[in-house]
Curated annotation (Swiss-Prot):
Coiled coil: none annotated. Residues 18-42 are annotated as: Disordered. CDD domains: S4. Signal peptide: none annotated. It comes from the Bacteria. SUPFAM superfamilies: Alpha-L RNA-binding motif (SSF55174). GO terms for molecular function: rRNA binding; structural constituent of ribosome. HAMAP family: Ribosomal_uS4_B. This is Small ribosomal subunit protein uS4. Part of the 30S ribosomal subunit. Contacts protein S5. The interaction surface between S4 and S5 is involved in control of translational fidelity. Belongs to the universal ribosomal protein uS4 family. PANTHER family: 30S 40S RIBOSOMAL PROTEIN (PTHR11831), SMALL RIBOSOMAL SUBUNIT PROTEIN US4M (PTHR11831:SF4).
Amino acid sequence: MSRYRGARLRVTRRLGDLPGLTRKAAKRSYPPGQHGQARRKRSEYAIRLEEKQKLRFNYGVSERQLVRYVKKARAQGGSTGTNLLKLLENRLDNVCFRLGFGPTIPGSRQLVNHGHVTVNGRVVDIASYQCKAGDVIAIREKKPSKKLAETNLEFPGLANIPPHLELEKSKLTAKVVGKCEREWVALEINELLVVEYYSRKV
């Protein structure tokens, strides 16, 4: 399953607030479609599937990528759900979003893919790059790159930068100073349900 490129508000109407996907709030609180307002009891599978979809759409990863992250999270030991969230939070596109360099995760991914971002002094155009403690993330010293980031920083997607990231706004540089903790994840998600969803599939 490829990365979603359709109407974002349609997704948020179905899944709820996804801060990484879009800034806009859905005007209607019920799911889209002819039967969107109908009340019916959902199965446990449907609930787990919805939580998985929240994770996939918020971070903008394909089903195949998410499966790989689940396998990696499981191999790390400890809480698979927490490990999974940390892996997604440490993606370079998400880190750029949390810093305010991009308005959303898709916007930040575009910033990375187009070569506007450096890590430790080198251009990194791979959105899935795993940021780690000590990494210095910066916007390239080019006028178009700086203008893009400066514009986005005026209206960041999220109000607060998590404590494991330090931003020097005037220099358009930041540093990863620690590990991302579960409570700093902006998305409202029950990651245990995601792990349960994949328990028989992965």
